[in-house]
């Protein structure tokens, strides 16, 4: 069974293509030609009136939309350059305007085939000078309905490359009405050569369309291009690994002041090196977190947690930790402010006063530590010294004896420079003068020197 057939010509093909791209009903297209042929036997004229079904043309979406290099190719063929010849149907898609004023002989809405629905129309025409002298090209249009309007160039002239070589240029112009009123009519004009201005008498191609309001128009292909771009972005974007948030910027570790007496503490630390206990703990915490980040960064990829719900959960936990840390810092500042008003703080603000029993126990621990070091040194040297009286004895005597000796210390004046700490003392502890709790720690440390 033979399929359906129709008689067509170049005009009908071009008309169908233009109608397929338009928003109007293709069934209401007015044909400008009626293709026909004669029967070779009886010379009967055969046309499409004998066909039961009208020729459906081409599906909606088929359009003539050449790229910039393709337009330059058609322009070269129209001008007879580079040995090119025009396509037999090119006049149906890019008609030639032969008026004396070129494309500016009338308002763009009056040009053949031009519509205001956003479809594009192409025209061949020659470049014409506006005046007999000079090089300025004609841009002004005399219109009885809209008055004088003019095409104004916008932006810079862009080169058009064909087969790796610049063969033409492109200009973009906008139509302005009276009193510099901008319209939605846009024209892209193409000419041959590498110069910005076209030569008089040479053919140019003008692509004219009525730009639709941006809020009402969705450009064809934008949605598909956006989806493709998202797919490409997802394919090339590396998977993000969760990172433990840093609560504070790590700072160089500084020595902590352990003595309030300036003449003793100067041997160990300087006032500028002093940091509070809270700052030290915060710096140590930050260093531990940085070490964890470095360990995670050198783990193999298959051991790393993948992004997804776990990543979101990790980020939420990190944000929560940062908020908690901020609250803790505020509380620390409040505590520092309260500490300045509390008389139980030292002048240095670094230690809280201990009661007598706690102080004795702390000194006992320090003395045991120093004693163990002395025993190790004596063992290594092969000699063994007798046990010497030490501060730890007060842990067995009780706090009352310690308080009494401290009170007596305030009444006795003694020069500590003549004391030899390496020999057993010939005096009671009450004969020594202690300035503060830190003095005991510094004095105990001096045994190891």
From Swiss-Prot:
Gene Ontology annotations for the cellular component aspect, listed alphabetically: nucleus
Annotated Gene3D superfamilies: NAC domain
Keyword set, alphabetical order: DNA-binding, Nucleus, Phosphoprotein, Transcription, Transcription regulation
An MF annotation (GO) of this entry: transcription cis-regulatory region binding
GO BP field: DNA damage checkpoint signaling; regulation of meiotic nuclear division; response to gamma radiation
Biased composition, class Basic and acidic residues, residue ranges: 324-336
DNA-binding region: 167-217
Domain remarks: The NAC domain includes a DNA-binding domain and a dimerization domain.
PANTHER family: NAC DOMAIN-CONTAINING PROTEIN 73 (PTHR31079), SUPPRESSOR OF GAMMA RESPONSE 1 (PTHR31079:SF9)
Name of the molecule in the record: SUPPRESSOR OF GAMMA RESPONSE 1
Organism field: Arabidopsis thaliana (Mouse-ear cress)
GN (gene name): SOG1
